[in-house]
Amino acid sequence: MKKRLISLFLILCLCSVALVGCGRKKEKADVFYYTFSDTYISSVRTALKKELTDRGLSSSDYDGSGSQTTQTEQVRTAVTGGAKVLLVNIVNTGSDDAATEIVGLAKNAGVPLVFFNREVSDGIVNSYDQCAFVGTRAEEAGILQGEMIGEYLLAHYDELDLNGDGRISYILFKGEEGNNEAIYRTKYSVEKANEMLMAAGKKPLRFYDESNKNEYLVDKNGQWSAAAANEYMTTALTTHNAANKNMIELVICNNDGMAEGAISALNAAGYNTGAGAPAIPVFGVDATEAAVALIRDGKMTGTVKQDAAGMAKALALLAANATEGKALMDSTGAFSVDETVRKIRIPYAKYFGE
C-alpha cells in the first residue's frame, strides 16, 4: 500500500510539472524587414527563423515593403501589443529621423531594440542602453570586391580588353541612394580596383557612358533589384556592344540580385550562358544561393560573401538575452564588437566558387 501511494504521488508530481511546462508561454521576437523581396534579406530571414526556434523563441515577421511609414507603424503596433524584443532592419538610412522615432517607441516602453543589416549611427545606438546593432562594416564589401576585380583583371587583362584600347570599360549598378552599404560598395569597388591596376602599370577603369557624371546606375525604387539592373543592362547593350566595337567589358553590382538581372540581359545578348560561351566578368555581393549557382555554372565571376547565418546567430543571441532578462550584450565575446558602441560586426569574405 505504501509503495502504491508513493508511486501515485510521483505520478501526480510529474503531471504537475508537465502541466506547468505546457502552460508556459513561448517568448516571441518581433522582426521587421525593410522588404521581403530582397534576396539576401530572405536568406537572413530563413536563417533567423531557425536560430530563434533553436533557442525556444517564436517570431512574427513584418514586411516593410520599402516604406518607412509602414515599418514605423508596424513597430508602434508591436510595442502597443506588448512586444518583448524588436529586431529592426530599418528602411530609411539616409538620416537618423526614422531610427530616432523607433528608438523613442522602444525606449518609452522599455523594450530592447536591435537594428540589423542596414546600419544606424553610433549616436542612435548610444541613445538607449537597451539598443544594439548587428551588421557588417559598410566599406569592407567594397574593398574586397575591388580587390577581387583587380586580381581578376590583372590575370586576364588582354582577353578582357575586347576593343584593344588598353582600358577596361565598366557598368556599375547601385542599389540605393543614401544607403551607406551602397555608397561604400560603389566607391571602394572602383577605387580599390584602380589602385591595383595602376600599381601594375595599367590604366584605370572607365565608365562606359561618359555623359553619366555619377558613374553608376541606381535602382530608383531603392530595392537593389534584379529588374532594375536587367532594364539598365538591356538598354546599355543596345548602344554598347561588339558590333559597335565598344562592348562593356566589366559589370560591377552592389548585390547579387542586381548581378542576376545583369546576367539575364547578357544571356539575351549571347553572353555568360556557360559552357565556353563568350563572357563578361560580373561581380556581386552577398553570395546568395542563386549567385553561388551562377558562379558554379560559369555565368558569374565572383561575389563577396555576406554571412546570413552569422548575422542570424548574433541576432538570436541578443533576442534570447532580451527575453531572458539578461544584459543585451551578454555572451557576445565570440563576435567582433566595436569598442565604443554596441555594434556587432559580421565579417565578409571573397568568393570565386568552391
For each feature predicted by the language model, list its residue ranges.
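Short, solvent-exposed amphipathic alpha-helices that sit
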Residues: 40-54, 141-145, 180-207, 211, ...
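C-terminal motif of bacterial Sec signal peptides marking the signal peptidase cleavage site
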Residues: 18-21
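Extracytoplasmic "Venus flytrap"
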Residues: 28-47, 51-52, 60-77, 81, ...
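Hinge/cleft segment of the Venus flytrap/periplasmic-binding protein
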Residues: 55, 164-169, 173-177, 181, ...
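Hydrophobic alpha-helical
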Residues: 85-109, 113, 189, 211-292
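Flexible loop/hinge segments that line or gate small-molecule binding clefts
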Residues: 102-140, 144, 156-169, 173, ...
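Hydrophobic alpha-helical segments within soluble ligand-binding/sensing domains
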Residues: 71, 132-165, 184, 226-233, ...
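Beta-alpha junction/loop-to-helix N-cap segments that form part of ligand/metal-binding clefts
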Residues: 65-138, 256-259
